[in-house]
Amino acid sequence: MTIAEFVYTILLKPRPLRRAANAAIRALLPGRIRVGEATVWLNPDDPVISGALTLGVYERGEIAYFRSRFGADMTFVDIGANVGLYSALALSTPGFRGRVLAIEPHSESRVYLHKTIRSNAAPAGAGLISELAASDRPGTLTLYNNRENKGDNRLYPDSLLHGEETVGADSLDNICRRHGISTAQFIKIDVQGAEARVVRGASGLLGRSTECILMTEFWPYGLARCGSDGLEYLEMLQDLGFRLYELSHASGIPAPLANPRALVERTQGRRYANLVGLKGESVLKTVNSARQS
């Protein structure tokens, strides 16, 4: 649990305190912020993610890693894009000549995602948006919404979630095919426990992507609620050819994942980790040289 989570879930657990804190944060939020060269539009009704971005404490290690590894010629698939932070970082990369596909089924977040995509200088047509949920099959799903944290919408009910919407879904392979994407060099998956479903529906894309960096949240509780298992998810990624690393929340430095079972055991309940999967000789050379320097 991070310091921010401790403050929000423990110190501000009483509803009157939380309501007051949320109101104060909302009043201070700007319409948009700069993260390096990127412009990110904020949801003014999201005190958690928008507040953390405004204060500069949101996913600092993950942002540092992304910025250090993303290349201007890469195709990036951003699954669970929210308001488009990582898509903006990609599009604003100096000399960008790749493509970005931002996938976000939450209709409210997508309003700000569209603004973010439009606000970052990139070649016409470089930034694409899909309103479908990436899953393992076509259909419709119920997305349960968190009113206080718009990045915590899930595909299963929970006491923290109030309100729901029906969203279209399809496999990641099909979504990418519709947008003319056959391979990706960088993929981010942050979908509150539905990560295994995404990967099951992406065998074609991941198989063809021989040089690939994959950033993924690893939350065994969420995976279980979506019908999967933490160890199964790790093995699934390894079977697809990814070498796994755990990403430091503070520094963004990846450390080899030596004991998957131990990781599962220490990420129970609300605890989670951020992982990086690396595939391909040139990608692995990059991380090895970084660790040696």
Please give the residue ranges for each predicted region.
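Phosphate/nucleotide-binding beta-alpha loop and adjacent structural elements of enzyme active sites
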Residues: 1-293
